């Protein structure tokens, strides 16, 4: 089994641990190490046992020296070595096959080069990187090769938009598009400005970098953060080149989401039950079918995404990277 280690146990690291435990039967990798430069092991245990959003109620978690001991309902025990060290002093650097950089502090190749020693062959960054290759699961993950040592999974908004936009462009052609997000944010990140706040969104830059058919002249992102801890909301607009009926669009999307190239990435719901029912969804976005509209060649899609739980696509990418052909490629033959 491929070994991984997490650096950074904030919201993303917490969600990743829970998602991995809940989907361990599908995982090609083990989480063997966790480091955080701020939190002690006792503080981490307290967070795991008391967080009101990410609930580990199917697991009994305790401490044994410098290890988190996790026992599931099946009685199986998992031990994870925990360290509370600055980045340059992490004692297990070079031991895992894959380094999961989840601190949000190290988002460039230069920041992550230190991890590529010993057994470590790949580094996966849990945030947008502007110089590492962005690998979006369900869009370009099959382009990953042995030379891609340090990669980013994108972001929650990038994963929600890019595979869908790519599909729509291939099928109908996209003339222009905009993406609108109401995105949750912890209160402390807004400091004294504790209300709605418009911000820059990574999709504004990453979208055109990944998709050749959008640019600053035909693509706009409106990104508003709001201080609460629930599921976030999105609205997409696509002006299509091809003249297509509403029903044809609905049928094509339904097929793509259920059994086509977007299966497992997106879902179509028959009614709008509000955002909170989509807490911990495995989908990058869930769209509401009755709220889907077409007006003058524009397709409007409304839905929800659990941005904190975009670890679902990070998990998928780590799982893909953990396959033998990626982590241990066959040596090239020479004549």
Region locations from a protein language model:
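N-terminal Rossmann-like NAD(P) cofactor-binding subdomain of oxidoreductases
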Residues: 1-189, 305, 323-334
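Electropositive phosphate-/nucleotide-binding environments in soluble metabolic enzymes
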Residues: 6, 10, 14, 105-106, ...
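C-terminal substrate-binding/catalytic lobe of Rossmann-fold NAD(P)-dependent oxidoreductases
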Residues: 18, 23-91, 173-176, 181-302
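Short intrinsically disordered coil segments
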Residues: 97, 251-254, 320
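NAD(P)-dependent Rossmann-like dehydrogenase/reductase catalytic/cofactor-binding core
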Residues: 282-335
């Amino acid at each position: 089994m491929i070994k991984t280690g997490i650096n950074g146990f904030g919201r993303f690291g917490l969600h990743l641990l829970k998602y991995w435990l809940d989907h361990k039967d599908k995982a090609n990798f083990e989480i063997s190490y966790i480091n955080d430069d701020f939190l002690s092991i006792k503080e981490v245990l307290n967070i795991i046992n008391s967080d009101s959003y990410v609930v580990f109620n199917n697991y009994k978690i305790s401490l044994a020296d410098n290890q988190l001991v996790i026992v599931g309902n099946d009685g199986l025990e998992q031990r994870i070595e925990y360290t509370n060290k600055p980045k340059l002093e992490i004692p297990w650097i070079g031991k895992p096959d894959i380094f999961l950089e989840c601190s949000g502090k190290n988002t460039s190749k230069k920041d992550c080069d230190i991890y590529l020693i010993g057994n470590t062959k790949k580094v996966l960054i849990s945030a947008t990187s502007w110089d590492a290759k962005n690998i979006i699961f369900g869009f370009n993950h099959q382009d990953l090769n042995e030379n891609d040592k340090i990669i980013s999974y994108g972001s929650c908004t990038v994963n929600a938009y890019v595979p869908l936009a790519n599909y729509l462009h291939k099928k109908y052609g996209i003339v222009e598009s905009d993406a609108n997000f109401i995105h949750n944010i912890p209160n402390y990140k807004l400091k004294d400005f504790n209300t709605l706040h418009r911000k820059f969104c990574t999709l504004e830059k990453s979208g055109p970098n990944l998709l050749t058919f959008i640019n600053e002249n035909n693509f706009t992102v409106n990104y508003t953060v709001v201080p609460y801890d629930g599921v976030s909301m999105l609205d997409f607009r696509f002006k299509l080149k091809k003249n297509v009926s509403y029903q044809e669009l609905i049928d094509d999307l339904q097929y793509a989401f259920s059994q086509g190239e977007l299966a497992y990435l997106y879902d179509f719901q028959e009614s709008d039950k509000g955002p909170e029912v989509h807490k911990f969804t495995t989908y990058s976005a869930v769209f509401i079918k009755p709220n889907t509209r077409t007006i003058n060649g524009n397709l409007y899609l409304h839905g929800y995404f659990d941005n904190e739980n975009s670890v679902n696509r990070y998990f998928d990418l780590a799982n893909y990277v953990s396959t033998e052909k990626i982590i241990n490629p066959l040596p090239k033959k020479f004549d």
